[in-house]
C-alpha cells in the first residue's frame, strides 16, 4: 500500500473557519435539540468517499445521522461518516481528516463539517459494536466491498451501555470538581489545576460514552474535544471562546495535569485556575443536559 504523506505537518488542519458556522447553528438552538434536516450534494459526498478510498482502502463507508435520515448525531450540519477497514487502519482518524482536508478543502464544499470515524473490523465487532450497529442499521452504505448484512440496533442494550458510562464518568467528574473547589479555597492551586483537568476529562468521557455506548482510549483534553466537536456548537464555543481552534483552557489543563504529577514547580495563578474551575462547572451542566437529552432519545427507541 502506498504511503500517504503526513499532511498534519504540512498544514494546521485545525485552522479553519469553524466559528461562524458554529455560532450560526448554536443561535436559537436549545441544548440537545436535533439538527435541522439538510439535503446534501451526492456528488460532493461521492468525492469525499473517493478520497477516503484512496487513502485507506476501506471495507465499507457508512453515512449515518441526520443527513442519512437516521437518528440524529451531530448538532452541527455535518457528514457523519463511519469508515471500516479490514485490518488496523494505516493512519489515525485525525491523519485521515487532515489528508481529506488537503485533497478536498472545506471551502470547496457546501457542507464544511465532516465527523469522521475510522475503525477496524475488530473494533466494530467489539469495542464499537453498539455504535456500529446503530450506524449500519439506520444509515446509508456509500461503499462496500461485499454485500452488507444489516442487523437491527438493539437500543435496549445501547441505552444501558450509554447510561452506565454516563453515571460512572459524570459522578467522577462531580467528585473531582467538588475537590477542586475545596483546594481552590485552601489556596492549593497546583492540586486545583490537577483536579479540574481530571474533572474535564471525566466529563468528556461521559459525553463520548453516551453518544457511542463505548469507551475511548483518548485522554488528551484537546484531542477529546476535537473528536466530538460537531456534537454541540454550544460546547465547542464554551471551551474555545478565543476561537483559536485549539482550546486554550483545555491545552493549559493538559499541561497542568502533567506538570502537577512530574514537576517540582507547577504554580498556576489563582485568577486563571479559578476561571477554569468556573468554566468546567458550566461545562458540566451543559454536558449533563446533552447526555440526558441523548439518553431520552435512546429510551424512546427501545
Regions found by a protein language model. Name each.
Residues 82-86:
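Short hydrophobic/aromatic beta-strand micro-patches
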